[in-house]
């Protein structure tokens, strides 16, 4: 990224914490003028990533620049980034998202909310919608990990990790930061079968973009899920899970922002 872009991002970005209900959620806000915010996009990062991922910085820069009055909030899930929790629990992830949504509404006095979820973040967004309804005008998902349990077992974990879990022991796995995964967390993933849920009520407000070369989560599963729920699905030819190709990432972000504005 050019140095000029970094200057813009540093000027736009502000750190803050949400300290509510026993939670301390580390957040990053992007906006030009906090007093002129009309709408907020909430970003939900993937497994073992964080609010500092450059992909969210790029998304925030584009959204704020192209749609006046837009703010973007990125936050760390439990056990991710700067978060202090040690054990990953699905219900606590739901609580974090609910508190961020409530903060965005009250801080900026707006109900015009949007969501952008990637991989595990996409899974958690859909779980939130299934259990709590949809507080967002539009929801964009990039390579959502619709079967998170299988992604962990088949791709992210080693055979030794799986053996430890089967023996009732937690394991440390991940990328930017290692995340402690317990047998109980894996049981939670099995208990909440996202693929069996229906999202017809929200289908018109959901967009899924998925790379055909995704090496982490199944492209075919995502496509079938979208078809079953009548959700718009955009196949990005040759894109891997993280959209390493800058041109493919740029095109995806432009498509998401256009979707928000439609």
Question: What would you call each of these model-derived segments?
Answer:
Residues 47, 76-81, 145, 239-240:
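Short beta-to-alpha linker loops that shape the active-site pocket of alpha/beta-hydrolase fold enzymes
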Residues 25, 88, 135-224, 228-235, ...:
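The alpha/beta-hydrolase serine catalytic core
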Residues 115-117, 142:
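Short beta-strand immediately N-terminal to the catalytic nucleophile in serine-hydrolase-like folds
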Residues 4-34:
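N-terminal cap/lid segment of alpha/beta-hydrolase-fold proteins
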Residues 78-108:
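Catalytic nucleophile-loop/oxyanion-hole region of alpha/beta-hydrolase
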Residues 43-47, 119, 211:
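Glycine-rich His-Gly loop
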């Amino acid at each position: 990224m050019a140095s000029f872009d970094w200057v813009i991002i540093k000027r736009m970005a502000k750190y803050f914490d949400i300290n509510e209900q026993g939670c301390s959620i580390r957040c990053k806000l992007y906006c030009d003028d906090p007093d002129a915010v009309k709408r907020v996009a909430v970003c939900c990062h993937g497994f073992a990533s964080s609010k500092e991922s450059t992909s969210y910085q790029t998304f925030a820069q584009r959204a704020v620049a192209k749609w006046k009055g837009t703010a973007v909030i990125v936050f760390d899930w439990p056990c991710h980034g700067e978060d202090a929790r040690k054990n990953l629990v699905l219900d606590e992830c739901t609580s974090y998202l609910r508190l961020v949504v409530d903060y965005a509404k009250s801080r900026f006095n707006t109900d015009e909310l949007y969501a952008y979820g990637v991989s595990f973040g996409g899974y958690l967004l859909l779980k939130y919608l299934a259990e709590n309804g949809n507080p967002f005008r539009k929801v964009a998902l990039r390579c959502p990990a619709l079967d998170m349990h299988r992604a962990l077992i088949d791709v992210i974990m080693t055979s030794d990790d799986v053996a430890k879990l089967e023996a009732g022991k937690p394991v440390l796995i991940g990328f930017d930061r290692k995340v402690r995964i317990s047998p109980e967390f894996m049981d939670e993933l099995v208990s909440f079968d996202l693929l069996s849920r229906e999202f017809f009520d929200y289908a018109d407000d959901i967009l899924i973009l998925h790379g055909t070369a995704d090496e982490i989560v199944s492209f075919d599963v995502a496509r079938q899920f979208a078809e079953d729920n009548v959700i718009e699905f955009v196949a990005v030819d040759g894109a891997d899970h993280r959209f390493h190709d800058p041109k493919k990432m740029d095109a995806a972000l432009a498509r998401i922002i256009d979707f928000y504005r439609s």
